[in-house]
Each structure stands twice: as C-alpha cells, then as structure tokens.
Amino acid sequence: MAVAYADKPNHFINFPLTQFEGFVLNYKGLQFQLLDEGVDCKIQTAPHISLAMLDIQPEDYRSVDVAIQEVIDDMHWGEGFQIKFDNPHILGRCIVLDVKGVEELHDDLVNYIRDKGCVADQSRKWIGHCTIAQLTDAALSIKENVDFINSMQFNYKITINPSSPARLEIVKLGAEKKDGFYETIVSHWMGSRFEYNPPTDKLAMIMGYCCSEVVRKELEEGDLPENDDDAWFKLSYHYENNSWFFRHVYRKVLISVSLVNLDCNCLGFYESPVEED
C-alpha cells in the first residue's frame, strides 16, 4: 500500500521551547546579534521544533490526539534524553539551528499517527531544526550577511525527563502566537501521565474492568455516552486528561471488546486473561 505524505501540510506536531528559560536566553542572544549586525530579518517569536507535518481535517483531531498520548505513554524514559542545538546556518530563507536527539520521537509520532489512518510526515527527509529568524530576499543576497550568519556560534543542551516542562502539541499552520507560544488544538505535558497510581478513586475502582457495561455500573447514570467507542474515548479524557486509563484499562479493551456482548469476565469479577503491556 502506498504511503500518503503531508507534502501540502495544514498542521504540525509542535515541541515548544519557550518554557526552557536557559535555552531561550541564549536563543534570544542569537537574535540580538542578528539585529545588532543590521541583518534584515523577521525574528521568530515562538521558538519550537516541528516534529512532524500533518495533512489532517478536524475530524482527525481525536485520532492524532490519542496517538500523541500513546507515544508519551510508551516512552522508555530511563534517565531521560538530551536535545542538542548547534550550528546556526541558513536553510532556505530561514536561519536555523540543527537539532539532534528527537529523531526517535519524530519516528514514533509519525508511525503512531499513521497507524490511526492519518497523514503524517513529508516525502522529503525530515531534518530536525529550530528556526531563529526568516531572511528577506534582499538580506539573503548580501554576502556579508551570509558570512556573518555562518560565523555565529551556538551550543546548548536540554535534558528531557518526566519532570521537565516538555510538551507535544497539535498546531494549525498559521496559528496565532502569544507570549512565545502557538495557539494549540491539543497540548499534552509529556510527563503528566508518567504516573502508575490511579489519579482518582473512581479510576481505581474500574481499573480491572475490560468492558463498558461494568464500568457504567460503577459510574453515575448518564456519565458515559451510549456508544461504546464514544464511552471509552470519554473515559480516556476523564479527570484532567490523565492517560493513566490507557495503560491500565483501554488496551485490554482493544483485545477483549469482541467478548463484551458474549461472556465477559468482568461480570464475574474475574481477572482478565489478557496480559498487560
């Protein structure tokens, strides 16, 4: 089957950087150097990494949202990982930094989003970068500007772990910027779901169940939509969007859903034969 590419993207997966104060201080230092040198350019006011380009419609938001959560839930943190920024240079009309350390995250996002049937990534090879500024055509044609940009130095590392302020977001191309961030459709803190204790008593009560019928009995009447798919989706969003539910309940459901209307073990409060990941 041919792979569909987002060569005419309308959204992207964003990794914002404004919340990393040390990085931003050095990043703005580069921008000041450009302005001080008189380079005619438009400064980027929302530093970020574009991790994957998307060609999606509003009806795809839910699928991409869930894919992002699954990527976060499946991360093997260990001691975390580092993102390295260096080598200021010109890419097209932009002045950018090379970004290393997020290649695996990019691949995971693309694969998980494609598994949901959505179009992600472009036919050209993805290159991790962080835009500093965009040059005007006139500035790009001035040799002194090019030489100055090529002489600039930058080297900075950010460590990402479950307690860092890292986020993954769905952003529409052309979205407004405010206070260093893009307006987002979805934004998830990468560490917010790295928690193996039930976030609420109610989720603790239903954690071993594999079908919506028993879950409905534990919740208040009308808490869940009548449609099972919609019910599971709402549960995954319950209580401040904590995806703990995905790890401990939802994946069992994907396997045992065919048994829901037959002989569900939950009705007898037996342990599910399906092993957890």
From Swiss-Prot:
Top-level taxon: Viruses
Gene3D superfamilies xref list: Cyclic phosphodiesterase
Family per similarity comment: Belongs to the coronaviruses ns2a protein family.
Name this polypeptide is given: Non-structural protein 2a
Source organism: Bovine coronavirus (strain Quebec) (BCoV)
Lineage, broadest ranks: Viruses, Riboviria, Orthornavirae, Pisuviricota, Pisoniviricetes
